[in-house]
UniProtKB/Swiss-Prot annotation:
This is SsrA-binding protein. Residues 137-167 are annotated as: Disordered. Required for rescue of stalled ribosomes mediated by trans-translation. Binds to transfer-messenger RNA (tmRNA), required for stable association of tmRNA with ribosomes. tmRNA and SmpB together mimic tRNA shape, replacing the anticodon stem-loop with SmpB. tmRNA is encoded by the ssrA gene; the 2 termini fold to resemble tRNA(Ala) and it encodes a 'tag peptide', a short internal open reading frame. During trans-translation Ala-aminoacylated tmRNA acts like a tRNA, entering the A-site of stalled ribosomes, displacing the stalled mRNA. The gene is smpB. One of its GO terms (biological process) is trans-translation. It is found in: Cytoplasm. PROSITE patterns: SSRP (PS01317). GO terms for molecular function: RNA binding.
Length: 167
């Protein structure tokens, strides 16, 4: 039997690194600063996340008594989850950030009207990390402009490819 080359191992490790993405956040908000936060999880939640049963699309983060919590994110428990713990799918989960980061985020949220939106859930070595972004909501005309720009970029690439192929 032959061993897999090192490239394949590295490629597969990065492919399984991302657990869940919030693509809707890019559509609904102008994302500005991004932060990496740890999550305070229970054992059954980590097992469920390993099985790919996490959803952060409906989630958001808010500041309560100087700490940041993730609200509305769903981690569906496994059937064979621990019997001595009653799993709650949408409980508030504490985000672990440095005090300076919390203070910076707190001032931007309170004074400038930003929202904290989860954008990605991923593994960093053996720990689950959440990427949160400071965001401002888009108006409907902003969404239309973004769609037009995206379509224009796609058409431009198509024309350039066709031109380069014919040349």
């Amino acid at each position: 039997m032959s061993k897999k080359p090192a490239k394949d191992k590295a490629k597969s490790a990065t492919a399984t690194k991302t657990i869940a993405l919030n693509k809707r956040a890019r559509h609904e908000y102008h994302l500005e600063e991004r932060y990496e936060a740890g999550l305070a999880l229970q054992g059954w939640e980590v097992k469920a996340i390993r099985a790919g049963r996490a959803n952060i699309v409906d989630g958001y983060a808010y500041v309560r008594s100087g700490e940041i919590y993730l609200i509305g994110a769903q981690i569906t428990p496994l059937i064979q989850a621990s019997t001595h713990v009653i799993p709650v799918e949408r409980r508030d989960r504490k985000l672990l950030l440095h005090r300076a980061e919390i203070d910076k985020v707190l001032t931007r949220v309170e004074r400038e009207g930003y929202t904290l939106v989860p954008t990605a859930l991923y593994w960093s070595s053996n720990k689950v990390k959440l990427e949160i972004a400071l965001a401002k909501g888009k108006q409907s005309h902003d969404k239309r402009d973004a769609a037009k720009e995206r379509d224009w970029q796609r058409d431009k690439q198509r024309v350039m490819r066709r031109h380069n192929r014919d040349a």
